[in-house]
């Protein structure tokens, strides 16, 4: 899993799961 992709996903989607 790429950190960049994960970061982008978090930014795009609300922090539902912390």
Swiss-Prot record:
<keyword id="KW-0964">Secreted</keyword>
<keyword id="KW-0134">Cell wall</keyword>
<protein>
    <recommendedName>
        <fullName>27 kDa cell wall protein</fullName>
    </recommendedName>
</protein>
<dbReference type="GO" id="GO:0005576">
    <property type="term" value="C:extracellular region"/>
</dbReference>
């Amino acid at each position: 899993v790429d950190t960049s992709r994960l970061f982008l996903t978090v930014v795009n989607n609300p922090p539902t799961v912390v």
